[in-house]
A protein has these predicted regions:
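Helical transmembrane-bundle signal
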Residues: 10-20, 62-72, 93-100, 131-141
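Cytoplasmic juxtamembrane regions at transmembrane-helix boundaries
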Residues: 71-94, 152-159
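Peri-membrane helix termini and adjoining interfacial loops of integral membrane proteins
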Residues: 30-41, 105-114
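Interfacial helix-start motif at the membrane-water boundary
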Residues: 41-64
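Alpha-helical transmembrane segments of multi-pass integral membrane proteins
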Residues: 97-159
């Protein structure tokens, strides 16, 4: 049901993560190539082997979160399953926030220097904020789904 506020939060979060994944993938991989070549990681193959699956997971995590948020909109009649899917996407989104902090800590200055215009640099800074906004939206949707479920349960008790 799209008229419910939690569905709008989930749809907005899904859209933001899809845009984040689609437009940011090229710059994301560019930043990971920079992180792999940092001086304190040079010659340490074990850390590089750890980074390779991390690169794969974090490049497709926004797409996964986007799909989960979109799918959970259609579980409006099965609230427990909707809450479960939202919680999974919330935890993935929280991990994405931690990864964003770690990623941009090492590569922000380099990526900002690669941006061809000031507009693209502003878009880079918006990409930093995007996972945090989406995490808040997913949290709010979980809160409103629980509130909706409590309302339905209280009406069932009255009958």
């Amino acid at each position: 049901m799209i008229q419910r506020i939690q569905s709008l939060f989930l749809l907005l979060s899904s859209t933001l993560y899809l845009v984040y994944w689609y437009y940011g993938l090229e710059w994301y991989l560019e930043g990971f190539n920079l992180i792999k070549n940092l001086p304190f990681l040079a010659g340490k193959n074990t850390i590089l082997y750890i980074l390779d699956p991390l690169i794969f997971i974090t490049t497709y995590a926004p797409l996964t979160i986007s799909i989960l948020c979109f799918i959970s909109i259609f579980f409006f009649k099965i609230r427990r399953r909707q809450i479960l899917i939202c919680k999974i996407s919330y935890y993935l989104s929280f991990l994405m926030c931690m990864n964003t902090v770690w990623f941009f800590y090492f590569s922000l200055n380099y990526l900002a220097s690669l941006m061809p215009s000031m507009f693209m640099e502003i878009m880079l800074y918006l990409a930093i904020i995007n996972p945090f906004i989406c995490t808040i939206l997913i949290y709010l949707s979980i809160k409103f789904i629980k509130k909706d479920s409590d309302l339905v349960n209280s009406l069932n008790r009255i009958r």
